[in-house]
UniProtKB/Swiss-Prot annotation:
It comes from Elusimicrobium minutum (strain Pei191). The record marks 153 as: Transition state stabilizer. It catalyses: 3-amino-2-oxopropyl phosphate + 1-deoxy-D-xylulose 5-phosphate = pyridoxine 5'-phosphate + phosphate + 2 H2O + H(+). This is Pyridoxine 5'-phosphate synthase. One of its GO terms (biological process) is pyridoxine biosynthetic process.
Amino acid sequence: MTVKLGVNIDHVATLRSARGADFPDPLTAAKVCLGMGAEFIVVHLRGDRRHIKDKDIENLCKTYPGKIHLECAATKEMQDIALKYKPASVCLVPEFKGELTTRGGLNLNKKNFENISKITTNLQAKGIKVSLFINPAAEEVRLAKKTGAQIIELCTGPYSEAKTKKQQYKELEDLAMSSILGAELGLEVHSGHGLNYENVVPVANLEAMECLNIGFAIIAKSVFTGLAAAVMEMQEAVKERY
């Protein structure tokens, strides 16, 4: 299976926000990434609009229909924005005030489960595929399936942040088992969070893995190599086989 690459361009908008400017434009970044073979563009519209703005979502969805993967919290506000601009897919993620980045998967307890299931149904009714960002554990995969979501994105944060080879291997095993279970349940399996050029190959080699969503590492490298070269290098990494 050829693993697809989704490129998260949030930090192009972070650079724009650093000076309160109107550039660099995420739309230009999307053009470069798609031109270098990225399967789709990932953007996280946060409640505080710290980087990506509503207008970015509008422009991206109009310019690249079928290529925009929107990450957002499971709220009515975000549901309504998704229904308005109709990205190809939406990944529901946990979001907490003040966090620098998403720290883990969704809590699929009873209250959250009902809300997420409802939003999933509403988005799918308008032809938008739904993904859930979850921790790599069997129970989480099964609960995600029960919501009706078509995709799971397994959080690779613990794998990426592992301090020892032993811990990294253990986290990789969890990702492997969860990805296999997801595929057996008929779910499309993605992964992301903290992946970079040094640690991506083992995850890309997992049997059931279909897509990797990577942003910060690519944008950081692009400062030195240019965005096109950074995307190309990551494309080569996700296709590398043992």
